[in-house]
Amino acid sequence: MSSVNLNVLDDNVLIKPITEEKQGGIVLPSSAEKKPTKGEVIAIGSGSRNSSGERIALTVKTGDKVFYRQWAGTEVEHDNEKYVVMKESDLLAVIK
């Protein structure tokens, strides 16, 4: 599990994409490659607020491996590492 010095806000999740190893040695331009949809949760926010102002805790935790929507989130780079920040609702499943 990785750690990063970023404070994720609200119901956002910081994901480190896991890229699948390619077989066959064919090199594709980055625009033709399929974006990763699997990653590791690196950091989570404190949750959104309900109508009473109370925090609603996220269901994922740091270290979880997850599947997420292919075009979800915003790609960010921090300390020469690439991450994706997205809403927890863009996560599809936790891998057990």
UniProtKB/Swiss-Prot annotation:
Name the UniProt record assigns to this protein = Co-chaperonin GroES
Q: Give the quaternary structure.
A: Heptamer of 7 subunits arranged in a ring. Interacts with the chaperonin GroEL.
Q: Which UniProt keywords apply?
A: Chaperone, Cytoplasm
Against NCBIfam families, the record matches this protein to:
PRK00364.2-2 (NF001531), PRK00364.2-4 (NF001533)
Cross-referenced InterPro entries, in alphabetical order? Chaperonin_GroES, Chaperonin_GroES_sf, GroES-like_sf
- Name where it's found: Cytoplasm
- Annotated Gene Ontology cellular component terms: cytoplasm
Q: Which domain of life is it from?
A: Bacteria
Mind telling me which HAMAP family this protein's record contains?
Answer: CH10 (MF_00580)
For this chain, the family text in UniProt reads: Belongs to the GroES chaperonin family.
| Record bears the keyword Secreted | no
Pfam families from the UniProt entry: Cpn10
Please name the GO terms that the record assigns under molecular function: ATP binding; metal ion binding; protein folding chaperone; protein-folding chaperone binding; unfolded protein binding
Function, in words? Together with the chaperonin GroEL, plays an essential role in assisting protein folding. The GroEL-GroES system forms a nano-cage that allows encapsulation of the non-native substrate proteins and provides a physical environment optimized to promote and accelerate protein folding. GroES binds to the apical surface of the GroEL ring, thereby capping the opening of the GroEL channel.
Biological process (GO) annotations? Answer: chaperone cofactor-dependent protein refolding
Q: Which residues form a coiled coil?
A: none
